[in-house]
Amino acid sequence: MQTVTAVAHRGDPYRLRENTIASLRSALDRGADAVEIDLRLTRDGVPVLLHDDSLKRLWGHDRPLRSLSAEEVRGLTGGGVPTLADALAATADSRVMVDLPGVRDVRTVRPIMDVIRACGAADRVYYCAGAEAMLAVRAADPAAEIALTWTSLAPPRAALLAAVRPRWLNYRFALVDRELTARVHRDGLLVSVWTPDTARSQRRLLRAGVDSITTNRVDLLHALRER
């Protein structure tokens, strides 16, 4: 049995609306080791689960999140957009991969980390995004676990790796093969990939020796790795 970590991308979005409590719970019930969530801040600084910068795609309201208070978001979505605190409570002791699409500096990451610490979840949360956001995370927390999202076959510069100090390199799955995985492992890092959703692509990545797969089909991945 291969010990690859199965990470549920935004929960279980093929069955339930992404980044909702029901979706996260469904993914964990279907074999996820961890759930990936996207976080943004409301106007009043409350971290909530939302990938986009507005409510339009998922909730039908063409309103930028940054223009709304947490209470207004709750009202517009019928409580459907969870706060980070809600999500941490719902995922109990499971690992949570926090993607930070809206973070650009330390000022915007600190409210997120404050909630994670207040919920006693710092030891089970890790962070992913590009270099700018991960530099902010590292500046805010020297002990944070980081998966640096990387979109090039060329390795990150040594200076960037020294500044971010990631545990993982997080790649789009199509870039990854045995050779890249071996190179990253030689450099002392783990390989995470996103988001293969077919059995064929997941099998290929398992054979390539990756350490973690983030997918919208965590049930499929769970079945494959158990064979």
What is the predicted role of each segment?
Residues 1-227:
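Phosphate-group recognition and catalysis centered on beta-loop-alpha active-site segments
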